[in-house]
Amino acid sequence: MSKKAIVIYNSKRGSTKQYAEWIAGELGCTSVPLENLDYGSLGQFDVVIFGSWLRGSGIVGFDKFRKQIADCADKLIIFVTGISEYNPQNYQQICEINFKDGINMQNTLLYFCPGRYVPSEVKGLDKFLMAISKKVLISGATDNESSAAASTMVDAIENGVDNVDKRYTEQVLRAARK
């Protein structure tokens, strides 16, 4: 028996949308931009997949989404895109910032899919925040391991990076098919 799924996404520059379309294509379901979502329709789905991008470990658009989906929390799978290196500390920080109340992190699956960053496309607040991030990274690295990670991130901020790869959808697809 096949589960009925929906993929909801919030994408600013295309990475999250690309992953959402790949996931929806593999599951044979629809992908819907968050701004076009009919929250009343979520009850008909066995699996609700939400994807968005990270800004300072915050899942952009998730606050609004979370308030509307209390009845679907047990069917929720989340994927996030970003350019920072995935590690347990980043995962923990994402959880602490985004799962304070309403959704129990114990029952929610969260996956990281590496994203894309093109400096010339970044404007306004995002450009300002990336400049601050760069300064913090440069001044905050205290040991060789954190220094290497900071250097990699600074390079991505200055020169851009594209780590989008369909293989990162496999973890989300496995969870959706369980």
Functional labels for PLM-detected ranges:
Residues E26, S57-K178:
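FMN-binding flavodoxin-like domain, especially the glycine-rich phosphate-binding loop
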Residues M1-C72, E170-K178:
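N-terminal beta1-alpha1-beta2 submodule of the flavodoxin-like/Rossmannoid cofactor-binding fold
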